[in-house]
A protein has these predicted regions:
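Elongated, amphipathic alpha-helical interaction scaffolds
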Residues: 1-138
């Protein structure tokens, strides 16, 4: 049902509303990408994300709806996020061309302190953000 409502390429309005509610962004142009991420080898783990969205500024958003939460959920979603990122830069391109990536994990159990929690890579003691290229939302 989730993919049917939010993954419709012909009607992206529900997806834009979802992104507005979760990320507080006004997405004017969005492109729903192929959710299957192919590996470079036959032996690579097959990866199918619920939704992969590309915004007009190049930001890519992986969205996962999780009905059964387990202790490896975050690890799995990190894996998905980095797989999406690994396809961003092609041979000969500069690392500076890496786009921002956001992984949204919608957890149906909802046992979080606040309705939306946003995480980034930051230094532990001084809380200095290392990069704005990665964000995890749950």
């Amino acid at each position: 049902m989730f993919k049917k409502v939010f993954g419709n390429k012909n009607d992206t309005k529900p997806l834009k509303i979802l992104l507005k509610c979760i990320l507080d962004i006004e997405a004017k142009e969005i492109e729903i990408l192929n959710p299957e991420i192919l590996g470079s080898s036959y032996y690579d783990k097959r990866t199918i994300v619920d939704l992969i969205v590309k915004l007009e500024d190049g930001t890519k958003i992986g969205i996962e709806m999780n009905t059964n939460v387990n202790k490896y959920l975050i690890d799995r979603n990190l894996f998905y996020m980095f797989k999406i990122m690994s396809h961003d830069i092609k041979k000969g391109k500069m690392y500076s061309s890496l786009n921002k990536h956001i992984q949204i994990n919608i957890d149906c159990e909802g046992k979080h302190i606040s309705p939306i929690e946003r995480y980034s890579l930051m230094e532990k003691e001084k809380h200095k953000i290392l990069t704005d290229k990665i964000e995890i939302v749950r």
